[in-house]
Amino acid sequence: MLLDGDLWGGIRLPRTEPSRCPRVHDEGVAMRDRENQTDSPVVRRSYSLVGPDTKKAVEAGFDNAEWYRAPIDTDRLKVLMIRRNGRPAVDAVLWLALLGGAGTLAFLTLGTWWTVPAFAVFGALWGGSGDARWHENGHGTAFRSRWANDAMYNIASFMMLREPTLWRWSHIRHHSNTLIVGLDPEIGIQRPPSLLTVALNYLNLINGPKMLGKIVMHAFGHLEDFTRVLVPADKLRRVVWEARVFLLLLVGVLAAAVELGTIVPLLFVGLPSFYGAWLLWFFAITQHAGLREDVLDHRMSTRTVYINPVFRFLYLNMNYHVEHHMFPAVPYYNLPALHEEIKAYLPPPKTSMLDAYLEVFHALVMQHKDVTWEIPKSWVPPVESTKQDSTAREALLVATAPGSGEAELGPSSLLAPGELAPVEVDGLAYVLCRTLDGSYAFTDGVCTHGRARLSDGFLDDCILECPKHNGRFDVRTGEAVRLPAQKPLCTYPVTERDGRLVVRMREIEESAARPEVSAERTG
């Protein structure tokens, strides 16, 4: 599995301008030079996670690389990252009520033609809108309460036939390597695109049988390379047990259908993941289809579309998809406000679903003929005109006192409760946090999973969330408390002396022998 190396102790911050991407064209966007590109329009690439393009992507520096982020005021971003329970609860209750109402109507009208539109609505809410619930709760940003996110995520995972642990790690990889061939497991339309495959996806007739096959295979303990590449070894057993639970539930529904001599049970559980998938694909095809592969700029590989309020409810604002990929720590209900903050740095959004579909299908037709064809680039500010680390807070620069291993940080009133600040001690990156009870905590400044700068993250009392993959740490102990973060942060004791904050940094002597790693910007 292509995991980040172990990161312990302080991480060396670059002193120069933000690192440039591996290869930069005239707009400042990194692109991989496609080998063997000739005048021939047919160049078939390997989208496998263990194929030749995977090796090329890693060698080119695309794995967990630096992505462009639009400038935004850090205080405003902090407000936008705040999660609530009320709004997502209302949305969840309304969705479940509509689902239950459609299901009840479908049951009561069995044997009449009225049952057809009732099941159509039920399926769309189950196999279509359920995808948005799976996605938002999978990020852990919908609800403030972790248990609510996890409960909704697991329910929606079953509805979508997606094994929870496998798909959580798959989506983490998608955010790390969006549309990077050989690294992104969720490239829905591969080049050259098959228009027949696209059509069949509207009924889940391509991915659906594959997912059912994986559930059966995993339930019997057979784990293929795809799963082993994505999921850490210590989580593979969980994949097996989740598959067994899913298989047991599906077999139970199938047995009920056989016993009753009717397909009705399957129309309520199992088949909605197929006949309702048209709504999933109706929205999802607008996210990335036809856009550029192998670019480290979401503005080139992701699409934002303006849609009506009903669609935004069904889709949970994922039409603001560029914004979501740049700032995945922002909950879905704050994405419209985030869009207003950064839209000057983004390409013009598609004005409607029709506008988006015209672009998507024109691109698919052209790329079917010539895989190298690209959508003419919309205007975006060149990278050179926007400072790539403009969302980063200004670091407090301090040094350890000779012989003491201690560093003075500043007055005890340096931060208000709930605030955090980046600190650079002897050139290494750390983060100072103040919990709601007024206590200070001092930890490494770079995530142990995705090498993201934690000072760009979200502090909720004593829990610090990484801005890149939503992994979380308890700043009091350094413990990783939410995946994908697994390795703890190093922590350092902070004391108050004569109204001044002092941190003891003796552990830094051990850090000095460890490899230095540049703190990556996130996107």
Describe these PLM feature segments.
Residues 124-134, 163, 167, 211-214, ...:
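Transmembrane alpha-helical segments that form the membrane-embedded catalytic/substrate-channel core
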Residues 143-157, 336-341:
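Post-HEXXH active-site segment of zinc metalloproteases
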Residues 227-234, 298-320:
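Active-site-proximal inter-transmembrane loops
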Residues 391-461, 475, 488-523:
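N-terminal pre-ligand scaffold of iron-sulfur
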Residues 461-467, 480-489:
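Short cysteine/histidine-rich metal-coordination sites, predominantly Zn2+-binding motifs
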